[in-house]
Curated annotation (Swiss-Prot):
Leader sequence segment: 1-22
Substrates-to-products reaction catalysed: Hydrolysis of terminal, non-reducing alpha-D-mannose residues in alpha-D-mannosides
CC cofactor note: Binds 1 zinc ion per subunit.
SMART domains according to UniProt: Alpha-mann_mid
Protein name according to UniProt: Alpha-mannosidase C
Organism per entry: Dictyostelium discoideum
List of glycosylated residues: 60, 96, 192, 222, 248, 467, 516, 527, 589, 760, 769, 848, 872, 912, 1040, 1057
Keywords (A to Z) from UniProt: Glycoprotein, Glycosidase, Hydrolase, Metal-binding, Secreted, Signal, Zinc
Family named by the database record: Belongs to the glycosyl hydrolase 38 family.
Length: 1079
């Protein structure tokens, strides 16, 4: 709503406003019920943004907590709401016992209230669901262990758009209510002034839909959460009187008493009535947005209450004056916690909850509340702001927050890699604890005791890694929307915890789990410099591959080698297997070794690389001299069991002449790579700068040939956009190369096409071929089985092709990838993942705005791991899988656009910095193309395999000889009896960190937290979108499970004390607390 005033003096504005307030909008009829105002004191404390996390804590947060706690202790009428547990936990640990006891009393009195309770307020657009769960668990476990508190209210007031994932997860955490804020302002507000007129705006205002029952998931239709949208942001109330004719006379007055005193003057005897009138005017405007007579009114803002006295003292005067004049104002105000507001709303509207018995995971569903609207299966992307000056320039709202989906790509990539590494560390640490505890019970061996000391150190390292992972979920961290110094600090933290985990956690535990004798002083490393450091003929290296998924796996891996090195590869049974050496022209001509690796579920498999030739030397000349006294290897070699690897055929592809490349269908120019399931066909295209370009696909399973599909780099020219906002100046164009080069790699295992656009921009297409091994597993397919069913072949590396995209952007350029296929008529409908499930997107104009740059930006959506288009008639489907987030869209029929990297000279007013991304990341994607039914069977497992790669751990074997090595170490660690079924994902297996304080007993062992997810959506797959029934005892190998309890998602509430047999429906998730020991 907009107001126009006329006048030239500030004092005249005050008189005009005061007169207006006192005459009409303040008077209250005796027939009107009193408006109950729940004033919610709070401070929004970003976990990094304009300052680093450390700076915010030491310079701001400590002041806030110290002063607020002091104020609340002195005055029981005062209340405060706190969200970011990362700051509170640190502050709490810095306090003495006396102050801690005071805080406990404030919490008990409900003066100090925790809302949300996560480590931070995570971004909702591009943060992976496992990272969200982990950061919420961090906060919830601290609150539960220290205070017995179980948060019930979501508080996501600053992320740039609410996702359907968040209410789904929050409901599984036991939340009843949810508060959100940043949604498209054209949905919230009516813009109908002459100077800023947006047709159809303000539906929430018109229909009073600022509160609703949100049913976020079509796969879990009974999950719902009562949701409140902040009507006017989370800051202290203010009112702006807009003068469009004379903008300099626009007048804002508010109640942010730590803010600008000209706008937020302190309360005095002289201005008390006027200021009270203004606050009541704000209240009465806002209460009309709701369907009851209760108003949640935020009182605070970014890092507010550093001076809690000035905030509370000024507001005290207003509260006292307004409440004492209730007949005049019809308003009653009180300091409140967020739950008090919801309790009153529920009381007034008769909403109740009952247990939902229709699902396999325990949750509640609402009864009553018919007066509230219901929102189903919809999220609130893209968040859009409407700025007056921006509107005057473009005659439309053009601030679409779809840029941060792709901003600072390298940060997004490293963050996701760090989460994958943490996941491996958590699994390994849990198994090491189980085995170590069993050894200590059986044998008080000094070596085991030494390892227990290491486990404590390892635990501390993982705690720090977990904490940093939580920090990176913050809505200004992974988004790339913080200042450069803060972003650099995030990267520094990530690199430090990754280094600690890689160097001090994973190698030590892998060595421990593989040992079959007492621990040896043996050097395991996550770094393959031991291979790269001038290997000699006869050198032997072991590589132990760690699998963090609950499925047996068989897939291709790549290991870097020194140039001109020939090797032989042996598997865990010491049987020689095929391998291929490839020179990667997109990676500075570096040399890589490819071979197939098989690993058991959650297990480890060891492979051996033997240097057989360097610089054309050959080991066959004198075997005894090369391998010394390693009798086992000499025996294997002399009996012809070892063989050299199959070398790749490398050829540079010359440019074709213009006559032969003038037609995209010219057979003489077509170049093909493929396997037994498909071929990729490439041609030189004049319309694409005569670049070698993917032009068609042969489906050898369906006997369909030359199916049109193209892919190439595109670039947008920036138009005043920044790390938050995407505002391209027009449609994308094909990226123009500089002296391009093309290479083809052929071989029996892997084939590649590499296209070098520039020195720092390239694409490499990778196709894998089946291989036959002489091991007990004779296929490259990964197998799985249900409890009593035979193995089913489902996943293999021939089902997809990879594209390694190495990208860089010049100033005011935004680089992406465009796929196009005439065989898919998707009618501009596409699907993006929120991490757990696909959300349908439809290319459309918003609020009748067909401005070109808004049609582009407003139809880009966040992708966590999957984007796809399909043709429902032909059943053709194109699916792109990724292990990092970015923005994507379908702007034309049969088209998918992915936006990888952005760079702009525009200085966003808040950051006052350019978006200067000079990184050169490699972004790997998996591509599935073909029959829709076939793809839907396999896309979700393939996505998890991509996101959770095998981790290689290296060691030098030749120092002690291989026969001694295998006498000390097992080549396989297999903790599960059998692989999980492919629709069942083991999401979490981690050791409980701390007992609840009031139940603490050092003699009680800590339990283990475990989560399972049925990964298939309803109707995704006829074969796999089925309920799964399983028992944990059928899987854990040599471990004894004595107690299984179902809990909330963050393990702070027991739901079922006896959970032996588990049933999971499609896309259901269950959390368990188990007592387990080694047999």
């Amino acid at each position: 709503m907009f107001y126009k005033t006329f006048g030239f003096l500030f004092i005249y504005l005050i008189i005009l406003i005061s007169g207006t307030l006192s005459q009409k909008e303040i008077d209250s009829s005796n027939e009107q019920p009193v408006i109950e105002v729940f004033l919610v004191p709070h401070s929004h404390c970003d976990v990094g943004w304009l300052k680093t996390v450390e700076q915010y804590y030491t310079e701001n947060v400590t002041l806030i907590l110290n002063n607020v706690i002091e104020t609340l202790t002195k005055d029981k009428s005062k209340k405060f709401n706190w969200a970011e547990i990362i700051y509170f936990e640190r502050w709490w640990n810095d306090q003495n016992e006396t102050l801690q006891n005071q805080v406990k009393q404030l919490i008990s009195n409900k003066q100090f209230y925790f809302v949300g309770g996560g480590w931070t307020q995570n971004d909702e657009a591009i943060t992976d669901y496992q990272a969200v769960i982990n950061q919420m668990t961090l906060g919830h476990q601290f609150l539960f262990n220290q205070f017995g508190i179980k948060p019930e209210i979501g508080w996501q007031i600053d992320p740039f758009g609410p996702s359907t994932l968040t209410p789904t997860l929050f409901k599984l955490m036991g939340f009843k209510y949810h508060v959100i804020n940043r949604i498209d302002e054209r949905i919230k507000y009516i813009f109908n002034a002459t100077e800023m007129n947006i047709p159809e705006s303000g539906i929430m205002t018109i229909e009073r839909e600022f509160e609703f029952l949100w049913y976020p998931s079509s796969n879990n239709p009974n999950i719902s959460i009562f949701t409140h949208v902040l009507d006017h942001h989370y800051e202290s109330p203010s009112l702006t009187i807009v003068d469009y004719e004379i903008p300099n006379l626009t007048y804002t007055s508010g109640f942010d008493f730590e803010g600008n005193p000209k706008i937020n003057p302190p309360i005095t005897i002289l201005n008390l009535r006027f200021r009270a009138d203004l606050l009541v005017k704000i209240i009465k405007e806002r209460i009309d947005l709701f369907r009851h007579n209760n108003l949640l009114l935020p009182f605070g803002g970014d890092f507010r209450f550093q001076d809690s006295k000035i905030e509370f003292n000024n507001m005290d005067k207003l509260i006292k004056f307004i409440n004492s004049n209730q007949k005049t104002y019809g308003v009653n105000i009180k300091y409140s916690t967020v739950d008090e507001y919801f309790e009153k709303v529920i009381q007034d509207t008769n909403i109740n909850w009952k247990e939902d018995t229709t699902t396999t995971t325990t949750t509640t569903i609402p009864i009553g509340g018919d007066e509230f609207p219901k929102l189903s299966n919809l999220d609130y992307f893209d968040y859009t702001k409407c700025d007056y000056n921006d509107y005057q320039k473009y005659k439309t709202c053009s601030l679409y927050y779809s840029g941060f989906f792709s901003s600072y790509s390298e940060l997004k990539q490293i963050s996701r890699q760090s989460d994958s590494l943490l996941r491996i560390g958590e699994f390994l640490y849990s198994f090491a604890n189980l085995i170590s505890n069993n050894n200590n019970n059986d044998d008080d061996d000094d070596d085991d005791n030494d390892f227990n000391i290491q486990l404590k150190e390892i635990s501390n390292i993982l705690v720090q890694h977990r904490n940093v992972s939580g920090i990176l979920t913050h809505h200004d961290a992974i988004t790339g929307t913080a200042k450069t110094k803060v972003r650099d600090d995030y990267l520094l933290m990530l690199n430090q915890v990754q280094s600690n985990t890689m160097n001090n956690v994973i190698p030590n535990i892998v060595g421990y789990l593989l040992s079959n004798k007492s621990i040896q002083n043996f050097d395991y490393s996550c770094n393959n410099t031991i291979i790269m450091n001038s290997p000699q003929i006869g050198d032997i290296f072991s590589i132990s591959f760690t699998n963090s998924l609950g499925w047996d796996r068989s897939e291709y891996i790549q290991i870097q080698l020194p140039p001109s090195t020939i090797v032989t590869v042996y598997n865990y049974n010491l049987i020689s297997i095929q391998s291929q050496i490839v020179q990667r022209f997109d990676k500075d001509n570096q040399t890589f070794l490819y071979f197939n690796v098989e690993t058991p579920s959650l297990g480890i498999s060891t492979y051996f690389i033997i240097i057989t030739s360097t610089n054309d030397d050959n080991v066959d000349d004198d075997v005894d001299k090369v391998f010394g006294d390693d009798e086992l290897l000499i025996y294997l070699l002399k009996n012809g069991i070892l063989s050299k690897p199959i070398l790749s055929e490398i050829s540079e592809i010359s440019e074709l002449s213009s006559s032969s490349s003038s037609s995209s269908s010219s057979s003489s120019s077509q170049i093909t790579i493929g396997n037994s399931k498909f071929n990729l066909n490439f041609n030189y295209l004049n319309e694409n700068y005569n670049l070698l370009t993917l032009t068609s696909f042969d489906d050898l399973i369906e006997n369909e040939y030359s199916i049109p599909i193209t892919q190439n780099y595109i670039e947008y020219i920036s138009g005043n956009d920044n790390s938050y906002i995407f505002k391209p100046s027009g449609l994308p164009v094909n990226l123009k190369p500089e002296s391009p080069k093309f290479y083809k790699v052929t071989g029996s295992l892997v084939q590649m096409i590499t296209i070098l656009y520039t020195n720092n921009c390239s694409q490499t297409y990778i196709v894998y071929n089946s291989t036959t091994t002489t091991t007990t597993t004779t296929t490259t397919t990964t197998t799985t089985n249900n409890d009593d069913s035979p193995p089913l072949e489902l996943i293999n590396d021939e089902q997809y092709f990879e594209i390694d995209n190495i990208v860089a952007a010049g100033w005011n350029k935004e680089i992406g990838s465009q796929f196009s296929s005439e065989s898919i008529n998707n009618d501009k409908t596409f699907y993006t993942s929120n991490g757990l499930e696909l959300i349908e997107r439809n290319y459309k104009s918003l609020f009748n705005d067909t401005t070109e740059f808004n049609m582009i930006a407003g139809n880009y959506y966040p992708v966590i791991n999957t984007i796809q288009i399909l043709d429902n008639k032909s059943k053709k489907q194109l699916t792109i899988l990724t292990k990092q987030s970015f923005g994507a869209s379908s702007q034309n029929n049969g088209e998918l656009n992915l936006l990888f990297i952005r760079r702009s000279t525009d200085q966003f007013v808040t950051l006052n910095e350019t978006m200067n991304d000079i990184s050169n990341p490699l972004i790997k994607i998996k591509v599935l193309f073909g029959n829709s039914n076939s793809i839907e069977n396999i896309r979700t497992p393939h996505s998890l395999l991509l996101e959770n790669p095998l981790l290689p751990i290296y060691s030098i074997v030749s120092d002690i000889t291989i026969d001694k090595w295998i006498s000390i170490y097992n080549t396989v660690f297999k903790p599960f009896k059998t692989s999980l079924p492919y629709n069942l994902h083991l999401l979490t297996f981690t050791k409980q960190q701390q007992q609840q304080q009031q139940d603490f007993n050092e003699d009680n062992p800590l339990d283990y937290f475990i989560r399972f997810l049925n990964i298939y959506e309803i109707s995704q797959s006829e074969s796999f979108s089925q309920p799964i029934e399983f028992k944990l005892t059928n899987y854990f190998n040599n471990f004894n499970i004595t107690n299984i309890r179902e809990s909330s998602l963050t393990f702070n509430s027991i739901i079922n004390n006896n959970t032996n047999s588990i049933i999971l429906n499609p896309l259901n998730l269950i959390s368990l607390i188990i007592t387990i020991s080694k047999n």
